[in-house]
């Protein structure tokens, strides 16, 4: 498991996939550039995961592709490797564009592309809101092979003619369910309008609700599908529990009782609003507990430094909104607490997928008031999973 993907669970993933998709058992079988293969092995991959072995070849052939697989199965590397295979680094123009719902995810994708493309001399820029616009303009004018960004800033840079689109041959929508949800739909259309008509579209996500699949028909041509059946999306390897807290006010004491357990590893605590994140952070600190916190309203610099501290293990407990739930990979997180149950069931899998990345064991604990029982049952039904009452020895499951 040197590459961080657990082959035992990975081999059991069942794909509901287009007939023409074949499996490439090794990276060599994909006929990738020599310099790219070097980057892949240097990054720590030994052999492709289930989604990689099916999707990379199809994307490299130029096919529009919909790839769905669980959190932590190597989806980011799937499109990153494909992009690096198809771009021509001699041409200093943007040839691939990746759109993500959060700034942190866009930045993480940039670092994956840079690492995998380490021997290729690739230029990749993170084009995200909340950062200096002058720096964006300077980088884009210099010429970037790949741009990884958030829809608002990318659309702005295209309109200002700093992000030139005429050489773009691939558009990737990462965490497409969130991107295509209400907020970003218009901005994506905005970006898409400026792209050359022959642009290949790749859609990647852990969940693909029907309305998203329906929307992809508008800008994808005969897409090849690499899909995991929904019943398979139970996030094997992650133990899910609930704690019954009769009233909202009792959640805080319950969390304090759990604090010693949290710090055995690293934990993320999810709240539904930024006000709740701020309130809970203040209350925990007043009670002399060490926590850090993050939400979408914080300045980008502050968010970056909190993320860095957490990644390096300097902070062990992070309180956050759903801005953190999508695709952020911190290897040491093995406990997620839903202080508030997510308001939509798709976000549940994104949140608890933060623990147990790449097939490692993880634990998810849901605080459930009497008002929440219905939501919990709905989540169980949707993912065909069972969420049991938390046992007393939860600490043993983490150590």
UniProtKB/Swiss-Prot annotation:
SMART domains: DEXDc, HELICc. One of its GO terms (molecular function) is ATP hydrolysis activity. Residues 56-226 form the Helicase ATP-binding domain. It is found in: Nucleus, Nucleolus. One of its GO terms (biological process) is rRNA processing. Keywords: ATP-binding, Helicase, Hydrolase, Nucleotide-binding, Nucleus, Ribosome biogenesis, RNA-binding, rRNA processing. PROSITE patterns: DEAD_ATP_HELICASE, HELICASE_ATP_BIND_1, HELICASE_CTER, Q_MOTIF. GO terms for cellular component: nucleolar chromatin. Residues 237-398 form the Helicase C-terminal domain. ATP binds at residues 69-76. ATP-dependent RNA helicase involved in 40S ribosomal subunit biogenesis. Required for the processing and cleavage of 35S pre-rRNA at sites A0, A1, and A2, leading to mature 18S rRNA. The Q motif is unique to and characteristic of the DEAD box family of RNA helicases and controls ATP binding and hydrolysis. Belongs to the DEAD box helicase family. DDX48/FAL1 subfamily. This is ATP-dependent RNA helicase fal1. The lineage of its organism: Eukaryota, Fungi, Dikarya, Ascomycota, Pezizomycotina.
């Amino acid at each position: 498991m040197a590459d961080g993907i657990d082959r035992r669970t990975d081999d059991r993933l069942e794909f509901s996939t287009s007939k023409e998709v074949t499996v490439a058992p090794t990276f060599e079988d994909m006929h990738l550039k020599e310099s790219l293969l070097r980057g892949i092995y240097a990054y720590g991959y030994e052999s492709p995961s289930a989604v990689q072995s099916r999707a990379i070849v199809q994307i490299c052939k130029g096919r529009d592709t919909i790839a769905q697989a669980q959190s932590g199965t190597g989806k980011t590397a799937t499109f990153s490797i494909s992009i690096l295979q198809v771009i021509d680094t001699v041409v200093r123009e943007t040839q691939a564009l990746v759109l993500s719902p959060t700034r942190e995810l866009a930045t993480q994708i940039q670092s994956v592309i840079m690492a995998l493309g380490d021997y290729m001399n690739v230029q990749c820029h993170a084009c995200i809101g909340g950062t200096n616009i002058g720096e964006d303009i300077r980088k884009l004018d210099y010429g970037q092979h790949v741009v990884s960004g958030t829809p608002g800033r990318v659309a702005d840079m295209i309109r200002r003619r700093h992000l030139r689109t005429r050489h773009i041959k691939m558009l990737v929508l990462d965490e497409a369910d969130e991107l295509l949800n209400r907020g970003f739909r218009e901005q994506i259309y905005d970006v898409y309008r400026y792209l050359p008509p022959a642009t290949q579209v790749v859609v990647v996500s852990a969940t693909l609700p029907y309305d998203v699949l329906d929307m992809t028909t508008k800008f994808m041509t005969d897409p090849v599908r690499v899909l995991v059946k929904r019943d398979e999306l139970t996030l094997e390897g992650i133990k899910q529990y609930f704690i019954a807290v009769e009233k909202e006010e009792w959640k805080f004491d319950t969390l304090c009782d759990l604090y010693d357990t949290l710090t055995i590893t690293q934990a993320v605590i999810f709240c539904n609003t930024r006000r709740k994140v701020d309130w809970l952070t203040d209350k925990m600190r007043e009670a002399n507990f060490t926590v850090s916190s993050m939400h979408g309203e914080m300045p980008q610099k502050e968010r970056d430094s909190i993320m860095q501290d957490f990644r390096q293990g300097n902070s062990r407990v992070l309180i956050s909104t759903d801005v953190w739930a999508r695709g952020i990979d911190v290897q040491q997180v093995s406990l997620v607490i839903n202080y508030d149950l997510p308001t939509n069931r798709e976000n549940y899998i994104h949140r608890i997928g933060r623990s147990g990345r790449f097939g490692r064991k993880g634990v998810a604990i849901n605080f459930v008031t009497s008002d929440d029982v219905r939501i919990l049952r709905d989540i169980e039904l949707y993912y065909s999973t069972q969420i049991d009452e938390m046992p007393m020895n939860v600490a043993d499951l983490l150590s």
